């Protein structure tokens, strides 16, 4: 209570503490009072305490309750208690002290009503009283105290506690609890003290119960009792507890315990974990408590750990504490020094050594000099990563310790100088060396000689040389070499350095200008000599930068074995010159002439030449500046005149701010993306940077160029402003001339300063820094200089010299660079005069204001907005000769029929520019009548139609349409809306079209009609490939009367490099046919660069066209195509061309020495390139051979027919112009992919014998032999052709960036197939989204709808159309299957009429098995061949002229190779690919099946063979996979089980093949084992899965299986499998009104009414076997027929067998029920019938059903319980219940021999969810596998056989469910409600097992009065 109030508080505090000190202090704290050693004897005087306390209480009662009275009472109470408790005999009488505390507590409790808590001493006295009593109890054992003492104490304590509780004081609660339980008898406490593991919750509960104070008492008591381990355990738990807020006391107790345990490695590690500051606090506390020894042990231990771990945290404080404690405990100085030496040995840092030296000097002074020197030596020897400053401090320390030893001081100073060379250090070293030497006095030396020698050796270890025998001059020279980095040689120093200034000047002059010529050497020498003479007098010592640079480069002379600096190599070589012969000191070559020797020596020099003053020299000597500007601003004025002249000569070559003023770029702050095909515009530069990094990383040449130009920017060293080029920087640096070059560029503040620091200080004083753009008129202001520089850079970017070639967006600020770039595109005219555009600057300047008067237009274009040549008529990027223009004008007046206008030809100046991105009209920016303005950033490609522009308005040039619009945007909307057939922008990335430059001549041309020709297609069957095709435009001129208007032909642009390459190659083979004036290429396109601007070559080729008359006929271009060499070398100057890519690859490798990796990165090798194109079906091939084979096989083109076609076509060349109708027909035929390309005709194809297009002529002269191949199905062959052309025009999609489109239905080719829904979409994604959102389709059903949509789009292109014959239905289909499905879905056509519908198409190819009694029929020969090899063992050579027909989803394509078929299935029918060609993961995807017991040929009769044959014939219908021909013998199940380990902890899968002993853990592993080891195919594994995969689970007991009893079971199971063979039932017309879901069920054809009912579960079909069978219709009529039946020797009782229902995604019904978790899709009633009956009608033969029937299923519909008709297992179950009521005694007829063995399925338990599971009963005498009762339900279910439900068939007769409900209600008392829910949600789970309870089974079934029972009554 030292913190109490006033004197009274102090007295009370003393008194409160006194009981603990007096009673427990004299007694408890002594070790003699430890429990068991304290005598128990009564002590006199305790009786006098009661009256004293009563008197105090009486006095208190007489007074009013106040703070003063309470304070007085507490003071008197403490004094009285101290008087009695401090009796000198009290410590020997525990009973006496216990009585004292009892009375004191009782008295205080009775006085509590008269005390107030406003007095702080009240609670304080009570708390101290409780603690003192508890401390006494810790030392007393209950057994030591007599009952007459202990019991009254407990009773009094409880009464006092109750009294205090009335006033809210529960201080006695802990004491009462402890005394009742026993002070040391708490079970948790006992566990802790016995060091047993304790739960954290229990520890926290104990801590919360007793509190920190009581626990501290316990720990102190344990320490006093020397119970160190117990105290350690308790204190550690308290220190780590989160229940105690302040754990410092417990931490200290824990550390104290650890110190008591030393030496102990674990204790040392625990101490080392504590933070150093906490350790220091604990040391201080221990010292204050008088525990110096513990504090010293702790300090020594922690300091040792710090020294060993090199930790310097609080190292000085720790070392100081240690020294004080060491000296206090052991005053001996020698011991202290020895300990310091020991610490120095283990120290690893110099900081620790310094701390030790300091405490030694403090404690020992001169006596510790030797140890201090020893520690210094140790510090010098440490090779740590500490800085050199610390070692210099060590040297200074040594010099201070030994001030009289001159040699040591010299060594220390030299070491310090060598570590940190400085002029001051050199001066001090010089002073020491100038002092006279001293002789070492060994006798009077302060340190031993050995230690001194060790010190000198440690110092010399830091020297790069050994100056022991050097004089001061030599050492001084070496020191000067080191000082050369920061100091120069003075005049005095140079005298000893043998270096003349003339030699160095000659050397520097030579190093600077040797490579540029020697004509100015004399001038350079004189100039530099003068400069150095002027500066030499002013130089202080160590101020030359030249010498510092020289010292960095040295060479080793082989002649004199010395090292010299390279700057003196010539001077050094003179030493070795003899008889006029020069010897190279580096390579010892000899030269007779100096002119040859000097250049040779310079080759060895690595030092860079000094070019400090080159710019001044060159200006004076050469008159031109090519170097950098002088660094000093003062050197600039004298060059201003030359710079100005220079700038005048260069200014016209660069874009400058003065030229930007005329471009109307003011107040524009937009950043368009420079990337190819990207028209994004950003309002901030940072977003452009992010966009470039994300979208145009490494594959965009234009983006790379932009970044390169950005990196070329220069920065001013004075104002940090950025400039576009070095020219702009030089032009700007004139601003910084003068003595104050640093300038503040903020608005209205142009203060100048002489240093950058002054400028920075000035900027800090600015309130608001605002920077304005330098462009006059631009008022945009920035607060950040970086943003300003980006803004100004964009101004230059907008007005730069920009290349306008297609695909090239490169820009330049210099016209020379721009012209050099254009030369890369080979666009120079024949005379090479590319500077015509420069000459036309003046004329173009006059048009600038008219051309560009809206700055926002520049927002969308980065193109040629150069002021000088903005719109030049003969620009370098689109040049046409005058002769060409005149020819075009003449042709417009003539009657020529066709004029070829290429997409990249010279007609680029006639383009119609598409929609602008902004809303400004074109009338403000239109040029004169002779020019067309073309903004370059377009969202859409130009359309291919004729549009006339007369300078003021746009006029539509189509027949009968003369609409006029003011701007291009309105014209484009008109074209999209009114002429959608011709305006067909492809879905390609938005790409900037470059503006065409205007033509000088006023041309009047005819209307151009564009006919796009598809360039390329791919051979891939992927529907996603080939969507984006590049259109080759052929503009055919017609004489239409629009000659007075200038025509503008806009052509579509390709968007990818590979298709552009194809387009360029096509240009080589084009000819200008059907015209009087023909054009031919004067040159060939050979040397194309590989950059992104490949179109530029085509432009240059077209621009060089020379039109001349050609009277002779052109040769066949098809033959020219076949003779072409499309793969050409991309290097400039190399004209090699090759037919194949491989040949080009070898050319690069051998001719140009490219690596293969580098070649594969070239453009030609990056893309799929198919240059050889079929002119009929537009398919492309990579080889000419493939194209010839295609012509021969697909189009039956031979040499005779080709010759005939050529003759006819040549006649057409001279017949004159084609008719307009014919031209339109050709155009629509070329478009070909759009269903609405000709609205009057359903389909339009060019006739092969007519000259429909120029491409027909190309292939008309093929000279290959004719071999007509047998195409069995015209539909199939045409379908393959359609697949090849998929996407050229049929899938029109819209680019993302377009504005609103006004499109009608004809331009939305993706239509919804629902009858009442007229929605149509522009792309497939929109249609799919429509199906899923509007019609609630799920993902699995979209496959069929997608095919329907494609079928509808391909309707126009089909050769043979199947039209629906119903009235008011004009739908047409590609194949008979689609028609049959439509009739069944839409017109309720019964499936009986299906053969009539299917007969229209004729069977493509039906292959019947030729073996007797085998009804199998196949569609493909491979299936028949497979069937013959597997079923009939016919392995002879089977010849085939047949092909593989794809019958999935109604597809009729034919393939001759299996690889092509597999690729087709992967792309077109991907859902079936896994089932047809890839092994499934059986463990995750197959249902639980019943076990097919091993096949034994002897026990199986003819019936089993028939069953196996029928199974095989159906399981391999769609397989097309060959299996192993050799028969494989399998083990029996018993043999397989004996291979397994009986007590294995995991599942086991033994190999069932005879002779193989493999046992694996996973099902996938055994499947892989069969495939790899036994070469089994996937189809065979699927068939034999249950025989081959046997799962032995954990805990399975392996027992003997009696073979004699297993055989009947095998036989019966096989018989039941045979009986469950699939049958197809006829559906009566009367049932057609009710939708029927696809089910696969079988019923016995005959029912014996007298036969006794028996419930019997049998084997369920293999899920994959069912998967290949087709959908079946369930009907309970008597007309049931079976195509294949098995003869059963012993007919078993009637049994209902169920087959699994394939769910909509093709898997088994295990996942079928899982799909119910999704929302049930809504579907119309007609569509429900459509789905259900469509699969019925597609079944042509029961033995061959296309795979599609298992994928496309009807929608899961809501289930009406009234219409529920149980069948299969449910039916038999109900029937069994009903019969059991009538014939209860029939159960006696059950025979155990007919019970099948328990199925051991290998499926995982995950597939069990939602399945009907039937578990066959196990015979007692024939158990195969015993299931432990402890196994979980999932483990039991894994061994059960799955029987999927069949509950959706709807008929009129509905049996009652009451019996079933009653049975469930009575038998399943605990789960009846759950069972009803399962039935309600169509997910019943019924498990039949052997009864495990004693209740007779008859008692479970209802009585006759079932109506009286209610569901759920139990």
UniProtKB/Swiss-Prot annotation:
Keyword flag ATP-binding: no
GO CC field: nucleus
Subunit organization: Interacts with RIT1 and RIT2.
Tissue expression profile of the protein: Widely expressed in fetal and adult tissues.
Record PTM Phosphoserine, positions in chain: 41, 632, 634
Cellular compartment(s): Nucleus
UniProt GO MF annotations: DNA binding; DNA-binding transcription activator activity, RNA polymerase II-specific; DNA-binding transcription factor activity, RNA polymerase II-specific; zinc ion binding
Zn-finger (C2H2-type) residues: 582-604, 671-696, 714-736, 742-766, 771-795, 801-825, 954-979, 1127-1152, 1172-1195, 1310-1335, 1362-1387, 1407-1432, 1444-1469, 1549-1574
Name of the protein: Zinc finger protein Rlf
Further comment: In some small cell lung carcinoma (SCLC) cell lines, there is an intrachromosomal rearrangements at 1p32 fusing the first exon of the RLF gene with L-myc.
Domain of life: Eukaryota
Gene: RLF
Biased composition (Polar residues): 1629-1642, 1731-1741, 1796-1807
UniProt keywords, alphabetically: DNA-binding, Isopeptide bond, Metal-binding, Nucleus, Phosphoprotein, Repeat, Transcription, Transcription regulation, Ubl conjugation, Zinc, Zinc-finger
Disulfide bonds: none
Species the sequence originates in: Homo sapiens
Chain intervals for the UniProt region annotation (Disordered): 521-541, 882-907, 993-1028, 1231-1290, 1620-1654, 1725-1757, 1783-1807
Glycyl lysine isopeptide (Lys-Gly) (interchain with G-Cter in SUMO2) cross-link site: 622, 839, 1423, 1599, 1611, 1696, 1762
Stored Pfam families: zf-C2H2, zf-C2H2_ZN292
Role, per record: May be involved in transcriptional regulation.
């Amino acid at each position: 209570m030292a913190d109490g109030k006033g004197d009274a508080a102090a007295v009370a505090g003393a008194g409160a503490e006194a009981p603990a000190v007096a009673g427990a202090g004299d007694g408890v704290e002594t070790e003699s009072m430890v429990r068991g050693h304290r005598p128990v004897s009564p002590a006199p005087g305790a009786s006098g305490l009661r009256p004293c306390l009563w008197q105090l209480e009486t006095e208190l009662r007489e007074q009013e309750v106040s703070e003063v009275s309470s304070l007085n009472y507490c003071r008197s109470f403490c004094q009285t208690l101290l008087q009695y408790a401090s009796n000198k005999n009290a410590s020997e009488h525990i009973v006496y002290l216990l009585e004292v505390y009892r009375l004191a507590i009782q008295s205080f409790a009775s006085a509590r009503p008269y005390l107030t808590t406003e007095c702080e001493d009240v609670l304080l006295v009570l708390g101290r009283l409780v603690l003192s009593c508890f401390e006494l109890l810790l030392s007393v054992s209950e057994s030591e105290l007599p009952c007459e003492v202990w019991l009254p104490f407990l009773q009094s304590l409880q009464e006092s506690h109750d009294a205090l509780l009335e006033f809210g004081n529960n201080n006695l609660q802990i004491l009462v609890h402890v005394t009742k339980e026993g002070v040391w008898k708490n079970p948790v406490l006992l566990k802790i003290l016995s060091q047993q593991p304790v739960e954290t919750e229990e520890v926290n509960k104990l801590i919360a119960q007793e509190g920190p104070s009581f626990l501290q008492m316990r720990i102190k008591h344990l320490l006093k009792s020397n119970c160190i381990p117990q105290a350690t355990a308790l204190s550690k738990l308290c220190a780590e507890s989160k229940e105690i807020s302040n754990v410092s006391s417990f931490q200290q107790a824990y550390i104290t315990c650890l110190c008591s345990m030393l030496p102990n490695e674990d204790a040392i590690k625990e101490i080392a974990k504590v933070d150093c500051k906490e350790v220091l606090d604990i040391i201080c506390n221990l010292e204050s408590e008088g525990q110096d020894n513990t504090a010293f042990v702790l300090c020594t231990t922690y300091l040792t750990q710090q020294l060993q771990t090199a930790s310097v945290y609080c190292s000085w404080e720790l070392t100081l504490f240690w020294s004080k404690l060491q000296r206090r405990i052991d005053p001996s100085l020698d011991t202290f020094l020895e300990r310091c030496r020991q610490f120095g040995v283990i120290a690893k840092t110099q900081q620790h050594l310094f701390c030790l030296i300091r405490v030694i000097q403090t404690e020992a002074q001169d006596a510790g000099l030797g140890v201090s020197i020893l520690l210094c030596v140790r510090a010098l020897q440490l090779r740590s990563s500490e800085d050199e400053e610390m070692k210099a401090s060590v040297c200074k320390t040594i010099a201070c310790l030994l001030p009289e030893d001159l040699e040591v001081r010299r060594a220390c100073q030299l070491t310090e100088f060598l570590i940190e060379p400085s002029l001051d250090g050199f001066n001090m070293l010089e002073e020491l060396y100038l002092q006279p030497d001293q002789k070492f006095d060994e006798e009077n030396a302060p340190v031993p000689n050995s230690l001194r020698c060790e010190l000198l050796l440690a110092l010399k270890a830091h020297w790069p040389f050994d100056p022991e025998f050097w004089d001061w001059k030599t050492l001084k020279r070496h020191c000067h070499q080191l000082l050369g980095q920061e100091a120069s040689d003075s005049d005095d120093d140079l005298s000893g350095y043998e270096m003349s200034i003339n030699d160095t000047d000659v050397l520097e002059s030579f190093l600077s200008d040797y490579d540029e010529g020697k004509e100015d050497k004399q001038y350079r020498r004189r100039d530099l000599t003068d400069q150095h003479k002027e500066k030499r007098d002013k130089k202080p010592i160590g101020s030359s930068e030249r010498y510092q640079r020289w010292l960095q480069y040295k060479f080793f002379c082989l002649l004199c074995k010395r090292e010299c600096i390279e700057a003196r190599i010539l001077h050094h070589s003179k030493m070795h010159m003899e008889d006029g012969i020069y010897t190279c000191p580096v390579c010892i070559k000899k030269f007779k002439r100096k002119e040859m020797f000097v250049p040779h020596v310079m080759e060895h020099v690595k030092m860079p030449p000094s070019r400090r003053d080159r710019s001044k020299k060159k200006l004076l000597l050469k008159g031109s500046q090519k170097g950098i500007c002088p660094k000093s601003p003062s050197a600039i004025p004298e060059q201003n005149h030359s710079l100005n002249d220079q700038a005048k000569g260069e200014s016209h070559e660069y874009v400058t701010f003065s030229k930007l003023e005329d471009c109307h770029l003011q107040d524009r702050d937009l950043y368009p993306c420079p990337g190819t095909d990207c028209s994004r515009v950003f309002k901030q530069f940072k977003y452009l940077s992010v966009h470039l990094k994300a979208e145009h990383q490494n594959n965009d040449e234009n983006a790379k160029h932009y970044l390169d130009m950005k990196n070329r920017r220069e920065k001013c060293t004075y104002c940090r402003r950025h400039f576009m080029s070095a020219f702009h920087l030089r032009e700007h640096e004139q601003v910084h001339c003068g003595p104050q070059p640093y300038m503040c560029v903020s608005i209205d503040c142009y203060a100048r300063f002489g240093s950058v620091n002054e400028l920075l200080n000035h900027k800090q004083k600015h309130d608001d820094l605002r920077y304005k753009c330098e462009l006059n008129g631009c008022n945009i202001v920035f607060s950040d200089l970086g943003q300003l520089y980006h803004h100004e850079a964009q101004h230059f970017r907008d007005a730069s010299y920009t290349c306008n070639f297609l695909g090239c967006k490169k820009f330049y600020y210099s016209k020379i660079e721009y012209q050099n770039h254009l030369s890369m595109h080979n666009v120079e005219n024949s005379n090479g005069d590319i500077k015509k555009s420069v000459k036309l600057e003046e004329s173009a300047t006059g048009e600038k204001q008219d051309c560009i008067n809206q700055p926002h237009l520049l927002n969308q274009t980065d193109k040629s907005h150069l002021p000088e040549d903005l719109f030049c008529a003969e620009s370098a990027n689109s040049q046409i000769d005058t002769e060409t223009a005149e020819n075009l004008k003449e042709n417009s007046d003539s009657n020529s029929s066709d004029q070829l206008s290429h997409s990249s030809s010279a007609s680029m100046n006639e383009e119609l520019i598409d929609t602008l991105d902004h809303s400004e009209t074109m009338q403000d920016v239109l040029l004169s009548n002779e020019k067309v303005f073309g903004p370059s950033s377009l969202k859409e490609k130009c359309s291919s139609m004729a549009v006339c522009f007369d300078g003021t308005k746009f006029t539509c040039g189509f027949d009968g349409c003369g609409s006029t619009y003011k701007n291009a945007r309105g014209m484009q909307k008109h074209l999209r809306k009114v002429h959608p057939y011709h305006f067909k922008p492809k879905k390609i990335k938005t790409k900037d079209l470059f503006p065409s430059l205007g033509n000088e001549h006023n041309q009047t041309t005819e209307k151009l009609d564009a006919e796009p020709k598809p360039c390329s297609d791919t051979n891939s069957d992927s529907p996603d490939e080939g969507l984006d095709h590049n259109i080759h435009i052929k503009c055919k001129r017609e004489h239409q009367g629009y000659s007075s208007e200038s025509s503008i032909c806009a052509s579509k642009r390709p968007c990818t490099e590979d298709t552009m390459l194809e387009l360029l190659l096509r240009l080589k083979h084009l000819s200008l046919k059907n015209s009087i004036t023909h054009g031919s290429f004067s040159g060939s396109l050979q040397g194309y660069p590989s950059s992104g601007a490949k179109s530029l070559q085509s432009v240059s080729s077209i621009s060089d066209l020379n039109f001349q008359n050609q009277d002779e006929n052109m040769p066949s271009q098809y033959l020219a195509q076949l003779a072409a060499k499309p793969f050409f070398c991309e290097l400039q100057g190399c004209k090699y061309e090759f037919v194949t890519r491989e040949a080009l690859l070898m050319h690069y490798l051998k001719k140009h020495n490219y690596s293969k990796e580098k070649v594969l990165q070239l453009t030609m090798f990056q893309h799929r390139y198919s240059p050889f194109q079929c002119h009929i079906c537009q398919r492309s091939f990579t080889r000419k051979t493939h194209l010839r084979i295609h012509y021969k096989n697909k189009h039956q083109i031979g040499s005779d027919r080709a010759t005939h076609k050529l003759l006819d076509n040549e006649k057409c060349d001279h017949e004159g112009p084609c008719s307009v109708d014919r031209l339109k027909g050709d155009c629509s035929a070329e478009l070909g992919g759009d269903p609405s390309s000709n609205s009057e005709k359903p389909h339009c194809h060019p006739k092969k014998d007519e000259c429909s297009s120029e491409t027909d002529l190309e292939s008309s002269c093929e000279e290959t032999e004719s071999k007509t191949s047998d195409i069995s199905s015209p539909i199939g062959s045409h379908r393959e052709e359609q697949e090849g052309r998929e996407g050229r025009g049929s899938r029109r999609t819209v680019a993302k960036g377009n504005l609103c489109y006004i499109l009608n239905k004809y331009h939305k080719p993706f239509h919804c197939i629902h009858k009442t829904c007229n929605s149509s979409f522009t792309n497939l994604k929109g249609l799919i989204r429509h199906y899923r959102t509007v019609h609630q389709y799920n993902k699995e059903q979209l496959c069929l709808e997608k095919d329907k949509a494609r079928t509808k789009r391909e309707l126009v292109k089909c050769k043979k159309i199947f039209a629906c014959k119903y009235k008011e239905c004009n739908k047409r289909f590609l194949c008979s299957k689609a028609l049959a499905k439509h009739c069944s879905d839409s017109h309720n056509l019964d499936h009986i009429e299906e053969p009539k519908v299917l007969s229209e198409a004729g069977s493509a190819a039906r292959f019947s098995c030729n073996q007797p009694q085998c009804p199998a029929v196949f569609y493909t020969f491979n299936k028949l061949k497979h069937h013959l090899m597997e079923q009939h063992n016919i392995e002879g050579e089977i010849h085939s002229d047949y092909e593989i027909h794809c019958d999935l989803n109604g597809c009729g394509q034919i393939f001759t190779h299996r690889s092509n078929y597999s690729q087709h299935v992967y792309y077109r029918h991907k859902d079936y690919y896994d089932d047809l060609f890839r092994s499934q993961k059986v463990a995750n995807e197959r249902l639980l099946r019943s076990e097919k017991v091993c096949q034994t040929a002897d026990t199986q009769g003819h019936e089993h063979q028939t069953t196996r044959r029928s199974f095989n014939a159906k399981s391999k219908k769609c397989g097309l996979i060959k299996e192993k021909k050799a028969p494989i013998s399998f083990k029996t199940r018993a043999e397989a089980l004996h291979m397994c380990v009986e007590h294995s902890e995991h599942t086991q899968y033994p190999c069932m093949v005879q002779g193989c002993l493999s046992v694996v853990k996973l099902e996938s592993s055994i499947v892989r084992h069969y495939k790899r080891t036994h070469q089994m195919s996937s189809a065979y594994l699927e068939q034999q899965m249950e025989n081959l995969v046997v799962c032995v689970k954990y805990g399975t007991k392996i027992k003997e299986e009696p073979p004699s009893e297993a055989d009947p079971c095998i036989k019966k199971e096989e018989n039941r499998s045979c009986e469950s063979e699939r049958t197809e039932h006829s559906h009566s017309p009367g049932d057609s009104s009710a939708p029927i879901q696809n089910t696969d069920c079988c019923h016995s054809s005959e029912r014996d009414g007298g036969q006794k009912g028996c419930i019997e579960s049998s084997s369920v079909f293999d899920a994959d076997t069912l998967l290949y069978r087709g959908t079946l219709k369930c009907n309970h009529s008597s007309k049931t027929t079976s195509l294949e039946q098995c003869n059963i020797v012993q007919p078993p009782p009637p049994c209902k067998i169920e087959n699994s229902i394939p769910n909509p995604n093709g898997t088994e019904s295990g996942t079928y029920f899982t799909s119910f978790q999704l929302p049930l899709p809504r579907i119309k009633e007609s569509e429900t019938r459509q789905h259900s009956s469509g699969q019925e009608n597609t079944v042509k033969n029961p033995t061959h059903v296309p795979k599609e029937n298992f994928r496309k299923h009807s929608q899961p519909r809501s289930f009406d319980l009234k219409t529920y008709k149980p069948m299969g297992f449910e039916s038999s179950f109900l029937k069994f219940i009903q019969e059991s009521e009538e014939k209860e005694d029939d159960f006696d007829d059950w025979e155990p021999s007919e019970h099948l063995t328990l199925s051991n399925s290998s499926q995982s338990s995950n597939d069990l969810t939602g399945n009907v599971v039937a578990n066959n009963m196990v015979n007692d005498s024939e158990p195969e596998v015993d299931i432990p009762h402890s196994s979980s339900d999932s483990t039991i279910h894994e061994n059960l056989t799955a029987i999927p439900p069949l509950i959706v068939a709807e008929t009129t007769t509905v049996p009652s469910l009451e019996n079933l409900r009653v049975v469930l209600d009575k038998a399943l008392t605990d789960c009846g409600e759950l069972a009803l829910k399962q039935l309600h949600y169509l997910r019943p789970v019924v498990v039949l097992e052997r009864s495990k309870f004693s209740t007779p089974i008859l008692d479970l079934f209802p009585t006759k009065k079932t109506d009286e029972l209610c569901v759920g009554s139990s």
